[in-house]
Amino acid sequence: MKEFDTIAAIATALGEGGIAIIRVSGNKALEIVNKIFRGINGKDLLDIKPYTMRYGHMIDENNEIIDEVIVSFMKGPRSFTAEDTVEINCHGGIVATNKVLQNVIKAGARLAEPGEFTKRAFLNGRIDLSQAEAVMDIITAKTELSMKSAMTQSQGRLSTEINNLRKEALDILALIEYAVDFTEDDEEPDETIPVKVKEDVITLRGKVNNLIDTADEGKLIRDGLSMVIVGKPNVGKSSLLNALLNEKRAIVTDIAGTTRDVIEEYINLDGIPVRLVDTAGIRETEDVVEKIGVEKSKEKINEADLVILMLDTSRELDEEDKEIIDYIKDRKYIVLLNKVDLDRKLSSEIVDNLENKIELSAKTGFGIDDLKSKIKDLFFNGSIDAESVMVTNTRHKEALYRASENLDGALNGLNNNEFLDLVSIYVTSALRALGEITGAELEEDLVNKIFAEFCCGK
């Protein structure tokens, strides 16, 4: 069966480096690698003890040495895949690594599909689906905070929470089944059961909704905050970008319209991954290139989680500033009153009525810390706890929404005195939606799609 043949792939990033690892997993892993291994003093791998390493050489079909290696062996089920696993530590480098992999495949292994090692760990019951997805989140984490959140999920904290919710749903279904059986036996129904079912549904729905409430914060920790810097040309947007990056990334001149395109960078904002977008100024222009930049700026504003509006305090507000303010007023924003190190000329009732204003000098760095604090206040209530259970995955959030909607349906049925067996249909649907998060209830095609998004060797 394809799922349980022996697979192999490069587990480390392909490129020049000191060491690369080829991972081989399956019940013939040791036998296959042994065919192309020659140990020092003639030792092979068939007598290697689990969780030990052996030094030697990889050889080809002509018994010529390919590379100097150290081979480790993990006996299933105490391995990542829960299968016998061999890892070949060879020299890094594209040629050497691929040569070793090619010979492993010639010896009888199959090249692994993307995510197939993690998929086997899931299919073999070592981890559930949410833990498997956390593995990829650890790999792609952009900050220590996002990695810590992914580690929490990989250790099964979210899985435990979901399994507890599923148990509560099963308890509700058992209670309904008891009541329905009671009625079918022509016995007098217990009038307290619908009341108890309603109480339990309300409690379960509350817990599901509490998890949903963590999703926005969780998504920001996992994927990052999209933040757009917007304002008139030469207001100091590029200087702010450089101040946040601590390097000269954007061109800073006194010529209006210098930033003609959208500049994007990732920064680590006290553990929060932030995708920072420095836009071209928004203004009417006849310059074709600059006009394209202005349109891109508007697109980025519409996509952003947060808009940073920069105003120049060294001059009066003009019509162009007012147009920008009007464009972003219905979005989550912070107003930066820049160039406070210069003589102040800005005075406007429109500005006075704006929220979340911060005075700063992008040139000197004054006010940057206040900006960082304000961002955390707006999105994380001033503090971030990446170790608490939270929903970071859009797929999980959608499943929780479906569970909540079905529990709403169950509650409406109970309020309308519908038959309990009809109410149970909604509760069963909620149970299945929760099961999709851990993989307890999921179609095979969707499982394959999830793992296909993983990188090779993982």
UniProtKB/Swiss-Prot annotation:
Binding site residues for GTP: 234-239, 253-259, 278-281
A Pfam entry, by short name: TrmE_N
| GO MF annotations in UniProt | GTP binding; GTPase activity; metal ion binding
Keyword annotations of the record: Cytoplasm, GTP-binding, Hydrolase, Magnesium, Metal-binding, Nucleotide-binding, Potassium, tRNA processing
Subcellular location(s) of the protein: Cytoplasm
Q: Where is the TrmE-type G domain?
A: 224-380
Q: What are the GO cellular component annotations?
A: cytosol
For the ligand ((6S)-5-formyl-5,6,7,8-tetrahydrofolate), the binding residues are R23, E87, R126, K458
Instruction: Extract the coiled-coil ranges from the record.
Output: none
Q: Does the keyword Cell cycle apply?
A: no
**Co-factor remark:** Binds 1 potassium ion per subunit.
Binding residues for K(+): N234, T253, I255, T258
**Cofactor(s) required for function per UniProt:** K(+)
Keyword Glycosyltransferase on entry = no
**What quaternary arrangement does the UniProt entry report?**
Homodimer. Heterotetramer of two MnmE and two MnmG subunits.
Q: What does this protein do?
A: Exhibits a very high intrinsic GTPase hydrolysis rate. Involved in the addition of a carboxymethylaminomethyl (cmnm) group at the wobble position (U34) of certain tRNAs, forming tRNA-cmnm(5)s(2)U34.
Q: What HAMAP family would the database entry show?
A: GTPase_MnmE
Provide the protein name.
tRNA modification GTPase MnmE
Its taxonomic path starts at: Bacteria, Bacillati, Bacillota, Clostridia, Eubacteriales
The gene that this protein is the product of is mnmE
